[in-house]
From Swiss-Prot:
Domain of life of the organism encoding this protein: Eukaryota
Keywords of the record: Cytoplasm, Cytoskeleton, Microtubule, Nucleus
Protein function: Has a role in maintaining cell viability during stationary phase induced by stress response. May be involved in pre-mRNA splicing.
InterPro entries, per the entry: Nuclear_protein_DGCR14_ESS-2
Main location: nucleus
GO cellular component: catalytic step 2 spliceosome; cytoplasm; microtubule; nucleus; post-mRNA release spliceosomal complex; spindle
Stated name of the protein: Stress response protein bis1
Subunit details: Heterodimer with ish1.
Keyword Phosphoprotein recorded: no
Organism of derivation: Schizosaccharomyces pombe (strain 972 / ATCC 24843) (Fission yeast)
Subcellular location: Nucleus; Cytoplasm, Cytoskeleton, Spindle
GO biological process: one example: mRNA cis splicing, via spliceosome
Classification via Pfam families: Es2
Length: 384
């Protein structure tokens, strides 16, 4: 786009020159077979000019060899490629009838210049390409509307445009005005459509993120009973209390009361508590007392038996007195004395032998070192 300067008497203006030749025209849609046939003909004439001659030579060689199959297959091709140049080509005659543009007709007739592939595609197109182009235009239009709706950009009133001075025509201002770049920091404003994708932490949280945040927060009011419920539960009951009756009993099955009986169904209200721990039977209480007595007595007798055993070992008593003392001990003390004293290999079978052994073992053994012998020195001479 070029801008031309137009000088007037009063003011100077920048006017965009109007070029009428640069008008865009949509290509003419053709049927798919016709479009492909014309395109193949142009490619063959431009890039493979000797291809018809080569095919004709192959057909002639097949006739000389006698390959009738190749003759039957190339029968239609011989009619195309063995025709003289000045004769009418059926393909060249068919293409101009499909075209509408006058310049394209003249180029296809071959009077001035051969038509190129680019010019052919600019003038003509297939029906499939045309329908696809319409779909792309609709998509771009929807994207532009979405862009305007999302970012607040309106083509009629551009907010970020340079204020020019000296322009009288508003159309000229719109044609050369451009949008200023945003000076703020670029942030990621993309919002995913799929809830499983990562949700960006932008300045403005989406409704989905707010709902998730509310569901994960723990509120103190929701963790217990409300105050109104507690007050209602603590209020005294206004229901009439049925007076207890001595002759009436609560409903029970095999001695077990029906706990789930509603108020009013039972014949009376009992003051008994069905959730107490029952008292231990007398048999179990006597057994526990007996066990405690035996444990305390066994502890005392063990201490006394150990003392008596030690005195018996250290005393000068006869075997009969020792046996009498052993009979007064408990079985555990007797086993201890028998294991440590009577059946020990270090002691004899009689108390006298044990006494001598005890005396022997009680005497401490002292280790001594012999003093080395010192040679006698000469006597000190007497002083006169």
């Amino acid at each position: 786009m070029s801008l031309a300067k137009k000088i007037d008497d009063d003011e100077k203006q920048l006017v965009k020159p109007v070029n009428k030749e640069q008008t865009y025209k949509k290509p003419i849609p053709l049927e798919e077979d016709d479009y492909i046939e014309g395109l193949s003909y142009i490619i063959q004439q431009q890039y493979f000019p000797d291809l018809p001659k080569l095919k004709a030579e192959v057909v002639l060689e097949s006739e000389e060899v006698g390959s009738f199959d190749a003759q039957n297959e190339s029968r239609d091709e011989k009619l195309k490629y063995l025709i003289a140049k000045n004769s009418e080509d059926p393909l060249r005659k068919r293409l101009p009838s499909l075209a509408i543009h006058e310049i394209t007709k003249a180029q296809l007739d071959g009077e001035n210049k051969p038509i190129s592939v680019a010019s052919y595609q600019n003038k003509f197109t297939s029906e499939d390409n045309a329908s696809f182009g319409e779909l792309m235009e609709d998509e771009s239009r929807l994207r532009a509307e979405q862009h305007k709706r999302r970012f607040g950009v309106h083509s009629q009133q551009p907010s970020n445009s340079i204020q020019t001075i000296g322009y009288s025509n508003s159309d000229a201002i719109k044609s050369i005005a451009w949008k200023e770049k945003d000076k703020s920091i670029k942030t990621w404003n993309y919002q995913p459509k799929n809830a499983l994708m990562y949700t960006p932490e932008t300045n403005h949280s989406s409704s989905l993120s707010q709902i998730k945040k509310q569901s994960t927060e723990i509120q103190a009011d929701a963790t217990g009973l409300s105050q109104s419920f507690l007050e209602a539960a603590n209020q005294p009951s206004t229901d009439p209390i049925v007076p207890p009756s001595v002759n009436e009993t609560d409903a029970s099955v095999n001695g077990y009361p029906l706990v789930d009986v509603n108020f009013g169904q039972a014949v009376g209200s009992s003051s008994k508590s069905y959730f107490n721990i029952p008292e231990r039977p007398r048999r179990e209480r006597l057994h526990a007392m007996r066990v405690r007595d035996i444990r305390s007595h066994s502890t005392n007798t063990t201490i006394t038996s150990v003392d008596s055993a030690s005195t018996a070992l250290n005393s000068y008593s006869t075997p009969n007195s020792v046996s009498r003392k052993l009979t007064n001990l408990t079985p555990a003390a007797r086993r201890l004395v028998a294991r440590s004293y009577l059946r020990s290999p270090l002691h004899g079978s009689s108390p006298s032998a044990s006494r001598h052994t005890a005396l022997r073992t009680s005497i401490p053994k002292f280790s001594w070192t012999p003093t080395p012998r010192v040679k006698s020195t000469a006597p000190t001479p007497k002083r006169v």
